[in-house]
Every structure is written in C-alpha cells, then in structure tokens.
Swiss-Prot record:
Domain notes: The N-terminal domain interacts with the head of the 30S subunit; the C-terminal domain interacts with the body and contacts protein S4. The interaction surface between S4 and S5 is involved in control of translational fidelity.
Entry protein name: Small ribosomal subunit protein uS5
GO MF term (any one): structural constituent of ribosome
Location of the S5 DRBM domain: 12-75
UniProt KW keywords: Ribonucleoprotein, Ribosomal protein, RNA-binding, rRNA-binding
C-alpha cells in the first residue's frame, strides 16, 4: 500500500524492466541475491532509471525505484515524438531512434520501449544494435534522449531564430 500511495503522490509512471537472481560463492556455498532494473517518468519528458540489489525481490525493486527517482533527467519532446533522429551508446549497446508520424506508435524492443513509454514518447521508430543487455540499452536510450536538441536550443546556440534554422 505504501508503494501505491507514493506512486500517486508524485504522479510518476513506474516500470520494472528486469529482475535477476545473482549469486556470490563463498566457502559455505552460494549466497543468492536479486537485482532489479526500473525506469520512472512523468510521461512528459522527465525520466530516470535505477538499479537496485538486495537479498529479497521487493527490497531490490524498492531500491531501484528510489534510485530512479533520484536520477531524473529532462528531455525535450516534440508533440509526443522526437525532434530529430538521434543515436546513443553505452558500452557495447548502440541505439538509433527517429521521429515518426502521428499514429505510428512506439516501435522499439523491450527495455527501450519501457524508457520511451515513461518519457512520454508516443510515436518513434527505433533499433538497438550490438549488445541487448537491458542495463546498457536503458543507459544508451537515456543518453540518446538527453543529447537530443530542440530547434530553440540549436537556434540559441547558433545565435539565430527558430525560423532561420527550419529554413
């Protein structure tokens, strides 16, 4: 119940991407613990991801959610899609995303889809290359979204107005 109340209080969407059982081998045998990868977002351009580890699954998920809330970034969106095609990478994972017309939907796989949904992107075409490790895909996707610039940001950087940028 406390989790639901917290979710309603700050109005963030939460998605659990992966839960994994890991083990530590010690002299007496194996010690099992669990890891959880989560993303949170407000559906309007704010996203964060978190990775938690604990001896029990609920504790790992809770830690991951808390880390995701602390690790929030803001992304400039263009009416539910991207401003321009973007690439992101993290270690062996590379992602490519491009804007799509209204009604296309989110064409993305697994972990990338979860990030785009909580970010508030509704129409996008995307592809993951290289490693499909969920942690690396999430980090590459966030990297790509953070490096996306709106026409206003590009115009300000070049010292022009938006109409001159758009041609």
């Amino acid at each position: 119940m406390a989790k639901l109340e917290a979710q309603q209080k700050d109005d963030l969407q939460e998605k659990l991407i992966a839960v994994n059982r890991v083990s530590k081998v010690v002299k007496g045998g194996r010690i099992f613990s669990f890891t959880a990868l989560t993303v949170v977002g407000d559906g309007n351009g704010k996203i964060g991801y978190g990775y938690g580890k604990a001896r029990e699954v609920p504790a790992a998920i809770q830690k991951a959610m808390e880390k995701a809330r602390r690790n929030m970034v803001t992304v400039e969106l263009n009416a539910g899609t991207l401003h321009h095609p973007v690439k992101g990478r993290h270690t062996g994972s590379k992602v490519y995303m491009q804007p799509a017309s209204q009604g296309t939907g989110i064409i993305a796989g697994g972990a990338m889809r979860a990030v785009l949904e909580v970010a508030g992107v509704h129409n996008v075409l995307s592809k993951a290359y290289g490693s499909t490790n969920p942690i690396n895909i999430v980090r590459a996707t966030v990297d790509a979204l953070v490096h996306m610039k709106s026409p206003a940001q590009i115009a300000a950087k070049r010292g022009l107005n938006v109409d001159e940028i758009r041609g």
